[in-house]
Amino acid sequence: MPTVRLGARATPRIDVRKTYKLYIGGSFPRSESGRSYLVSTPGGEALANACRASKKDLRDAVRAARKAFEPWAARSAMNRGQILYRVAELMEGRRDQFVAEVAGGEGLGPGRARDAVEASIDRWVWYAGWADKLGQVLGNSNPVAGSFFNFTIPEPTGVVGLVAPERSSLLGLVSRLAPVLVGGNTAVVIASQGRPLPAVTLTEVLATSDVPGGVVNLLTGLRTELVPVLAGHVDVDAIDTWGVGPDDQREVEAAAADSIKRLARRPRGVSDERFDWADERAAQRPEWIAAFLEMKTVWHPIGA
């Protein structure tokens, strides 16, 4: 067959810019409001436009997380571990893209950005390994004075609202999201407001991995609009307020208390600006898994 040669390009090629969307129920919708906001580097250079999620978008995300909760919690612990490990595998294949987005958003050099991305991948692997060990480590067979067996079994809390760390757009997010998922919870995440791009790319990894739609739902936008609604939503069972600023912490905790939510927050005296997410002793802990588990105690008569 003859070879067909394409003619010289008449005009310079225009780059295809990426559209950063929300992630709700396994799909990538734009905000129902049609709004967006500009994401820039720390130096003020424009990077992209991100969707500015609305209250309705958040309600849709909570609804999707609730629908996905029971099937996700019913999966075997080993299977959840395999799925989280698969996330690490796919992140490894897109490492260069994550490095570029972390470097641009956080103002890091290529070396430090690569370190943050590789630590994020390793963190998925670390938490995946905990999936089938939670029952043995956190559960117990309790001694009782009577003809009964008494067992304590960890169970997932339900739908967890997660306000991601603002400064560490990828490693901080993974460090808070992975312990929520490994225990069988589903999540509604409000990404870093100023540095949301790596989080959106992470959802593209989740969508192409084995994580079922609705298990993770991620919103970008203004925290002043989204966080109070998340904290007060009656169908959210727990909230992680790590990314909430000190000025807003009391208000968020009061809203969470109205609907009796389980609450996880930064330890007192710990600043999000100074916390070292690369510190394996401080930033990956089984206690962070336990924060979103409830302990169910079962009594059973001996011989029955």
Regions found by a protein language model. Give the residues of each.
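Short beta->alpha linker loops
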Residues: 53, 105, 115-119, 193-197, ...
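Short acidic active-site motifs
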Residues: 148, 225-226
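Glycine-rich beta-to-alpha transition loops that act as phosphate-gripper elements at the mouths
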Residues: 163-164, 219-224, 242-244, 266-268
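Conserved small-residue-rich beta-alpha loop and adjacent elements
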Residues: 42, 129-212
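N-terminal Rossmann-like NAD(P)+-binding subdomain of aldehyde/semialdehyde dehydrogenases
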Residues: 1-148
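Short hydrophobic alpha-helical runs that function as membrane-insertion/retention elements
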Residues: 187-190, 217-219, 238-240
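Hydrophobic/aromatic ligand-binding patch that stacks against planar heteroaromatic rings
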Residues: 178-181, 229, 255
